Amino acid sequence: SRIVQSAVAKGSTLYNGKKYKEAAQKFELVYALSKKDTSFLENAALASFYAKNYDQSITLYKKLLSIGYTGITTQYKATNALSGEDMYFNSQKDMDNQVRLKLAAAPEVLVSESRTGNIAKNIALSYIAKGDQDAALKAIDDAKKIFPNDYTLIISEANIYFKLGDNKKFLELLKKAIELKPNDAQ
């Protein structure tokens, strides 16, 4: 619908202009008007985080997890037989027809990775930003079940333990982070 398209355009413009609070509201509106557009709920959560509205960010990220959102997308890509440029199709059937007619070649089905781990990590980072160490540690623990060797999660967890004065746990996690990325000075 026109209203949805207008809200998407306005939200994107606001986001690109670093007006995150307003962008989050527009992206939430898109989701409210079109529940199938769940990626806009993720956009709203991220914009809320950047707007330092951490409670809203946490609420939206948790909602994404509760509705089973993964963020996995599938793209159908082939090379235009005449121009050699990449072409994207709405469906496998459309792509296959173009290949069969020899209008396209080298078909590929591209499937993105799940966003679930990033969502769990962003919940933890929102709690850290709020200063809620206990909730952050629980969220990190949940996220590590999905991504046990995520460098950012390990560093975030180490920093919390440092703030809590648990130097033993801090050093243990730092050692693990160094093993994962020996050349990272973070």
Regions found by a protein language model. Give the residues of each.
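Helix-start (N-cap) detector for alpha-helical repeat units in TPR-like alpha-solenoids
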Residues: V4, D37-S39, I72, T116-G117, ...
